[in-house]
Amino acid sequence: MRLTGISHTSFAVSDMDLSLAFYRDVLGMTLIMEIERQGEFIERVVGFPGASLRIVGLKLRSGSDHVLELIEYRVPRGQRIDLRTCNVGSPHLCFVTDDIQSAYEELRSKGVQFKSPPVRIPSGPSAGGFDAYFLDPDGITLELSQPAPSGPRKA
């Protein structure tokens, strides 16, 4: 097997209009795609007979190639799950910034809920950088990360 890249990250959301307003209008991402999917293809892919989905794709305006895909399952309707980061399978997506304090203050002024102010990373490969977790409208954890002055965060 040869994997050649990562296409996108996807989150299931409860209300596409609310999520789109958050990711596009609050975080400043650009809408690159919006489609409705139903029928045999999507039923087979997701494994739900009668599936009907609204899907959007977003990118950062900075030119990053990574796509964030948001999916609202209209059929079947999903259930809320416990998204605390300690739970197995709980996702989070990290956004890199060169000024975490400014980004933190701007997002807080827009009503974004943070788990803490930016925290300095004390040790390890990212020592000297800063991280802060915040939540989207569905409670999905997102992260702001400012790399250490010595260079960008390594994956």
Annotate each predicted stretch with a short phrase.
Residues G39-R44, P76-I81, I121-S123, P152-R153:
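A short, acidic/glycine-rich surface segment
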